[in-house]
Regions:
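Gram-negative/organellar outer-membrane beta-barrel architecture
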Residues: 1-111, 119, 123, 221, ...
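Membrane-embedded beta-strands of outer-membrane beta-barrel proteins
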Residues: 6-8, 22, 62-66, 112-114, ...
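Strand-connecting loop/turn motifs
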Residues: 13-17, 69-73, 128, 165-171, ...
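Membrane-embedded beta-strand positions of outer-membrane beta-barrel proteins
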Residues: 20-22, 34-36, 76-78, 112-114, ...
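Outer-membrane beta-barrel transmembrane domain signature
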Residues: 100, 104-108, 169, 173, ...
């Protein structure tokens, strides 16, 4: 609870990252933290089921912040951050007309977060709540014509509840995820040619977008939301909300079967969030109403010594096909 602490985490191989954190705390005062995060990511990004681009980018993020130093369930922090984001390779497939010659972007911003976790177990919990709310506001410049000044923010949240129906046998897991981007330089079409043309994502700078797809929240960027039935990473509009319900049953001692259902909506602005859109493609000009997404799947899991081993079978109205996903261990 008191004194100096430092930790280092890294991932080698594909999509490398490194996280270094140093902190000093005292029982009577907030904890003082210094953090450095590095990410080297390469990913294919889709416009729903059409490949838009393949991109590799480097991200450096420095943070100094204060956080609480006493709670086992709450985690609260506020501070400043400096971020450098550099596209190393941008290869377009769908929108070849967009200029890919972009330089690094530097931002200075403030951030705050509130995380809560009182789950009864780290693996396959049966009761409790886990949630997070993260807010950032960034000011930045780009040394390339197009985006000169940036003033934009992001509000991202996630919630998981574990409700036992039959003790140690059947669990209901409601979930809610969302992200909202706003300000000058966000993807609402206020600052550069791509935005003015499509009123949609800014693909060369992933951290200025919302992404959906896969099973893990925040895997590639902070505003990356999971969606069952979509294994590919896809762009989304400024405002995204996804509701999900899992029903998990324990078949044997360490074997589990989970039925998963989710529904999502995305729109350019909040005024259009509850208006229907006829097609899913964000590239359809002048149609800013919300898209409707749905997906469902089954997951078979085994609790092993090195972490969960699972196989997902899923589909959605976005992919329009059956998807398979195999996972071994934890994402952290």
């Amino acid at each position: 609870m008191s004194g100096f602490k430092a930790d280092l985490n890294t991932k080698l191989g594909g999509n490398q990252w490194l996280k270094l954190n140093a902190s000093f705390g005292h029982m009577l005062y907030p904890k003082i933290n210094l953090a450095y995060n590095f990410r080297n990511s390469e990913l294919d990004v889709y416009d729903m089921d059409n490949l838009v681009m393949n991109q590799r980018f480097l991200q450096h993020k420095f943070r100094v912040y204060l956080s609480e130093n006493y709670s086992r369930t709450f985690c609260i922090g506020v501070g400043y951050e400096i971020e450098n984001l550099t596209p190393m390779k941008v290869m377009y497939s769908l929108y070849d007309a967009v200029d890919s010659d972009y330089k690094g972007i530097n931002t200075l911003g403030t951030f705050a977060y509130l995380h809560f976790d009182n789950l009864n177990k780290n693996r396959f919990p049966t009761r409790g709540v886990k949630g997070n709310i993260d807010f950032t506001w960034k000011d930045g410049t780009l040394s390339k014509k197009g985006i000169e000044k940036l003033h934009y923010g992001a509000l991202t949240f996630g919630f998981e509840g574990y409700i036992p129906i039959v003790e140690n046998r059947l669990v209901m897991i409601p979930q809610l995820y969302g992200s909202c981007l706003f300000g000058k330089g966000a993807v609402n079409g206020t600052t550069n040619g791509w935005n003015e043309m499509f009123k949609g994502p800014v693909p060369m700078y992933p951290s200025m977008n919302n992404l959906i797809g896969g099973a893990e929240m925040g895997r590639h960027i902070d505003q990356h939301l999971p969606f069952i039935g979509l294994n590919k990473i896809s762009f989304a509009f400024n405002n995204v909300a996804i509701a999900r319900l899992d029903i998990r049953t324990r078949l044997f001692k360490k074997h589990y079967l989970t039925a998963m259902f989710n529904y999502g909506r995305s729109s350019i602005d909040l005024n259009n969030f509850f208006k229907e859109k006829e097609t899913l493609e964000w590239s359809e000009m002048y149609n800013y109403n919300a898209s409707n997404w749905w997906g469902a799947g089954l997951r078979y899991s085994i609790d092993t010594k090195i972490g969960p081993l699972s196989l997902d079978i899923s589909s959605s109205n976005i992919s329009r096909k059956v998807n398979l996903y195999f996972n071994l261990g934890h994402f952290f």
